[in-house]
Amino acid sequence: MSHSVEYIIQHIPPVDTSLAGAAQAHLDNLTKPRGSLGRLEELALRLYCIQGGDTPLAADPARIYTIAGDHGVAAEGVSPFPQEVTRQMVLNFLSNGAGINVLCNTVGCEQFVVDAGSCGGAYPEHPRLIQRKIHPGTASIAQGPAMTAEQCRQALQLGIDLAGMAREAGCRTVGTGEMGISNTTPSTALYCAYLGLDPAGITGPGAGITPDLVKHKTDIIRRALAVNAGAVQSQNAVDILAALGGYEIAALTGLILGAAYHRMAVLVDGFISTAAWTAAWKICPAVSDYSFFSHASAEAGHKTALRSMGIEPLHDLGLRLGEGTGAALTLFLLRSAAAIFNDMATFSSAGVATQSSC
């Protein structure tokens, strides 16, 4: 049985950082110059702490959830794509035709598709589809709150339930992914509300709009922040999420909170996933202990948002697709870090002299 949103938030354990010394000592005793494997060593150390010092380290089993939702703000003309593309892409995911499918198949990672709030009716049943539609699309953030408080709570609970399902399946790692036409607009609004950023500095082309439409999109975000000023000024993280977010964004927030509660590593994807993570971090800062930021998105504003939170992502390949693609690529790095910790020989076991013994 899944725990409630309130219970999860109150019981997320910080990692035991006192274990870091033992992890570092082991890494320093492997047959290499100290620190020569760079950030892979940092990943291994963090995995060791997340897993409570249990060895061997494990990044697998891993699962990526690609969560779909539609947005009322699409009616404001902030995307070049019609809203029905969200539904079409859900079907594409289920047919293994999308970028996330190819990458998950390549790296050997399980992927589930979740309908949190796409427009239209139910989808045909599919073994990789979880249908938990809260409502067919949010209200427009340019006109008022995207969700009611209860709808936001349901979306958070959905994400928490997804984390619980992954843990019951034995997963050690979950990755975040999403699909929703116009969802860069609410994500940008969330960054502005949570981090005090200016829309003009972080609003980008999303799926490919013209400079004139970027200006229009910026104006829409400013309007959304003004219309929802009460929630923004309250600095209540959940109220802000309800006012400016989306069903898939709030579900990802719940997924991140739930994964941290279950002591799983979280691979955070790109621009939209990081907005969801920012909400989770504002709700419970301990989620940062479990989170690995896969990449710096090419979407304008992602690097600015990451920098404002002191976060250095693991790679920058110019990705801006979403879906969980960056998380899938980064799983290999997490696996590699675990393998280095588990399988490399120590100086003594390999009979290799250390620098101090030469």
Curated annotation (Swiss-Prot):
Keywords: Cobalamin biosynthesis, Glycosyltransferase, Transferase. It holds the Pfam family DBI_PRT. Pathway: Nucleoside biosynthesis; alpha-ribazole biosynthesis; alpha-ribazole from 5,6-dimethylbenzimidazole: step 1/2. It catalyses: 5,6-dimethylbenzimidazole + nicotinate beta-D-ribonucleotide = alpha-ribazole 5'-phosphate + nicotinate + H(+). It is an enzyme of class 2 (transferase). CDD domains: DMB-PRT_CobT. Its EC number is 2.4.2.21. One of its GO terms (biological process) is cobalamin biosynthetic process. Disulfide bonds: none annotated. Catalyzes the synthesis of alpha-ribazole-5'-phosphate from nicotinate mononucleotide (NAMN) and 5,6-dimethylbenzimidazole (DMB). Belongs to the CobT family. HAMAP family: CobT. This is Nicotinate-nucleotide--dimethylbenzimidazole phosphoribosyltransferase.
